[in-house]
């Protein structure tokens, strides 16, 4: 358990690479409208395999050897990470993956904030907060990115 919550306490949507697609947006809209969810956490994790697959595809194109479904995941992650390859991080594969994981989490959180009229309205007028965070597979610690409200 990451947040020490019981079954039914959290509305959880799991998807490789924490990508944002219409089904995930619809699920979040449902949770926010139906159940009053006011905190959405885009939780990625260190050494994410989907992000790694995207980096590998960008560095060494496979020419379509991935399935159409896996390619759809890679294609959704690509815009968040491709700019890092021209950065200094590209010379250090471990650092590149770390930065790419965080960039992908941020991009997914931003997509949710600005990719749904329903969520935009809930953010503007009803206190919905969308934040990114990274779970460390090594330590079990969740590192929340900026924008998390202080506890009351």
Descriptions of predicted regions:
Residues 42:
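Conserved functional hotspot residues or short segments at active or partner-binding sites
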Residues 46:
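Short, charge-patterned binding micro-sites
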Residues 8, 17-38, 49-152:
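Divalent-metal-activated hydrolytic enzyme cores
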Residues 2-15:
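Short helix-loop-beta junction
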């Amino acid at each position: 358990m990451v947040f020490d919550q019981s079954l039914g306490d959290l509305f959880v949507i799991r998807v490789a690479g924490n990508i944002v697609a219409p089904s995930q947006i619809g699920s979040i809209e449902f949770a926010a409208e139906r159940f009053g969810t006011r905190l959405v956490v885009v939780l990625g994790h260190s050494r994410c395999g989907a992000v790694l697959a995207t980096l590998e595809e960008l560095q060494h194109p496979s020419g379509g050897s991935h399935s159409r479904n896996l390619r759809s995941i890679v294609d959704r992650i690509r815009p968040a990470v491709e700019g890092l390859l021209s950065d200094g991080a590209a010379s250090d594969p471990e650092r590149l993956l770390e930065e790419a994981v965080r960039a992908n989490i941020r991009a997914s959180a931003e997509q949710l904030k600005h990719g749904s009229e329903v969520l935009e309205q809930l953010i503007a007028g009803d206190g919905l907060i969308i934040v990114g965070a990274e779970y460390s597979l090594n330590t079990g610690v969740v590192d929340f990115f900026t924008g998390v409200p202080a506890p009351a």
